[in-house]
Amino acid sequence: MQAVEQQKKSKLWALLSGILGIVWGGLIFVAPSYILPNIFSIVIFSIVFPFTAPSEETLQILHQTQTMFIYLVAFIWVMFIVARISHRYYKKTGEVPYWVTKIFLLAASLGVIATLPVLLSYIPGLTGINDVTLQIGGMGSILIITGGVSGLLGLISGAGYIISLNRFDR
């Protein structure tokens, strides 16, 4: 009997997945401390002075924060689509270890789960869902932790994809 030889897979999806995973992990760990430094002052301001009129600067910071969040949500959904495609593309091949594709898919899925309550609040009629979600005992912190775990797993799997690129030359 002749052995059926599997055709070589392209390393484009591995490169794209690696870059997306590393960038996502970097964004998750850098964003709270560098990109959104004023978010904590806004939260404290809104807790301490709930009945004062917000200043123009505060409104601008809120707008920038919301814009940054929309970019992060778009990034995580693109990463989720790429993770699904690359998981299916490299299934049962030797180029990319199976655990790398699984962890990348898990990282993207956790990121999508963390963004769902806020995304649903943009739908007319469901605008109060974010308030309800954040009022459930510690749900806001659970979503933040889920995003952080997603970033860590994205960083690990992105590095796994980049390391596995040298397997394609064999």
Task: Map each language-model feature to its residues.
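Interfacial non-cytosolic loop connecting adjacent transmembrane helices
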Residues: 38-66, 116-146
